[in-house]
């Protein structure tokens, strides 16, 4: 993989800049946008970026940092899913606490925002409190968004309980957008100033990158990733007016800046030092880019990947037609086509061949996988295994120089598993999933040295690209995610069945 980003340089620059910002205050509330851990989007568009860069940055500052996690009560009630992991937001909060603790970072508390006694949220609160985690409940802010006098009063932010903190940097993070991070920061600012303390607010948002051109694929990839939020990158007019310098920000931050500035000035009683939303940010990711061409190409591939994802989400009913249309416009903006993703055409061509051979009306499920050396392999559905499983076996055979004729998994192992699925568990399909095949392979590896050699090649699939001609099940997507393979799908179901496609 070609590297376009210097991780070490970025960490050094970023930590120095945050410490410079905190020097102006007794305490700095730092709103962390995006993902604190496993930032796979950043890793894909900035080759060389560490997906856990942010948490490693905080670990470097751990003596000065404590963390507040926000989660919106409505997201818990409707079981909102974090797309990249396939887990609900409440479960992600638990995962986040565990991950932060593993980096020796102090988790202060969890804040439930816009809480109004929702039943599922109350159960979640009980679960946290009984595990010794402090929980604060914040109601919707009275007067928000327009009535600044009410917002900045004992009826507004003053109604929220004050969260006791001890470190100079308080990071406020969340499982996803719309979790109430900003409101929590401002509520704390209000209480700090009431107590006579000088506190500040800043924002750490990786994308869009303020010092990279507006129409750079890196910034357009951010629009593609947030197409459902209707985020649009714009020139920060406030920044240009103040400094005669071009900076990129996104529409929501630019639109909300005048109100946010007024709220901060009302809380502090003095003019804000921030002249623009870009001023509020502390992001230095642009300074870590060392090869612009590599970043451009990686970002273009991410835009195509996001386009396929949007198509599948639309097919499943999660997104509206306007979002799908916007995704297409982003593709056209950079003259990108579906087949610019190398794995797409091999999968489709093999699928069309099989469809013709078996005289099927439906799309034939095929998965294509590109290895690091550029070799593209395919796998198809059969009675024994899914296409996902077939392509993984084909890949490890290729990497281990094992002949295609050699069976890695003994029929003695396969038959009892198939019988268990069909006869005991009552499964409609005998075909083994990718995960089931990998378990079978690991069993065979105990007595079969060839299978053991193949098993050892699985780690070489991390970072590979794949494409499926049909929508995969959640379990199959999860398995590929665990293997570190980026997979896209055509927005087609493998059959006309409704329930058994889920």
UniProtKB/Swiss-Prot annotation:
It holds the Pfam family DUF1846_C. It comes from the Bacteria. Belongs to the UPF0371 family. HAMAP family: UPF0371. This is UPF0371 protein CTC_00401. It comes from Clostridium tetani (strain Massachusetts / E88). The lineage of its organism: Bacteria, Bacillati, Bacillota, Clostridia, Eubacteriales.
